[in-house]
Amino acid sequence: MSPQIDAVILAGGMARRMGGNDKGLVELNDQPMIKHAIDRIKPQVKQILINANRNQNRYAEFGYPVLSDEDSGYLGPLAGMITAMGQTQADYLLVVPCDCPLLPTDLVQRMLAAITAEDAEMAVASDGKREQPVVLLMKPALRGSMKAFLDAGERKIDFWYAKHHCVVCDFSDQPNAFVNVNTPEQKQQLSEAIAH
């Protein structure tokens, strides 16, 4: 029997480099950024959760549960992951950011295969040059470990997953899959790339 997999799309940040605009709701080619991520992920998972700390009503319009961080204060992606891990009953939780509109359509399949092959606790995606710390497939049972890490004042996801049996899943055959949008300039470049 294949494992049940849920996903959380992280849209809980402050988006300082986007002038404070809520990145998930910024339009890219006539669609909110998060809609691109939803469309890529939806066929790959059982349920989608959205982690958002503002504009929750707008995010709820996409038809998925919207979760705010358990700990207020914009503690970063780890806080959103911890919240989602506490809400899922799935065997695995896929984590993706809201500002990656070109996510692989075989993301779950390949990450799950990598975990199975290595008997690992989680997988992190790589574009062939660097790991993508907010593109993870992991067991929700790791929530306690992640919460202890965050409670100790730590914030860097890669430091946390380095403490666990984490396999790197290579997507160098799709080098643009994890291109994300942090600035208006990047948004323009990506918009042009998608249009062609």
From Swiss-Prot:
* UniProt cross-references to InterPro entries, sorted A to Z: MobA-like_NTP_Trfase, Molybde_CF_guanTrfase, Nucleotide-diphossugar_trans
Output the Gene Ontology cellular-component terms. cytoplasm
Which Pfam families has this protein been placed in?
Answer: NTP_transf_3
Catalysed reaction per UniProt? Mo-molybdopterin + GTP + H(+) = Mo-molybdopterin guanine dinucleotide + diphosphate
Gene Ontology MF annotations: GTP binding; metal ion binding; molybdenum cofactor guanylyltransferase activity
Q: Which UniProt keywords apply?
A: Cytoplasm, GTP-binding, Magnesium, Metal-binding, Molybdenum cofactor biosynthesis, Nucleotide-binding, Transferase
As recorded in UniProt, its EC number(s) are: 2.7.7.77
Enzyme class, one word? transferase
- What Gene3D superfamilies does the entry give? Spore Coat Polysaccharide Biosynthesis Protein SpsA, Chain A
Subcellular location, principal? cytoplasm
Keyword Electron transport assigned to the entry: answer is no
Q: Which cofactor does it need?
A: Mg(2+)
Q: A GO term (biological process) for this protein?
A: bis(molybdopterin guanine dinucleotide)molybdenum biosynthetic process
The positions annotated for binding GTP are L10, A11, G12, K23, N51, D69, D99
Q: Where does Mg(2+) bind?
A: D99
Subcellular localization:
Cytoplasm
- Please describe the quaternary structure of this protein: Monomer.
Provide the family line. Belongs to the MobA family.
Regarding domains, what does the record say?
The N-terminal domain determines nucleotide recognition and specific binding, while the C-terminal domain determines the specific binding to the target protein.
Show the NCBIfam families listed in the entry.
Answer: molyb_mobA
Q: What task does this protein carry out? A: Transfers a GMP moiety from GTP to Mo-molybdopterin (Mo-MPT) cofactor (Moco or molybdenum cofactor) to form Mo-molybdopterin guanine dinucleotide (Mo-MGD) cofactor.
Q: What is this protein called?
A: Molybdenum cofactor guanylyltransferase
Recorded source organism is Shewanella loihica (strain ATCC BAA-1088 / PV-4)
Question: Source gene?
Answer: mobA
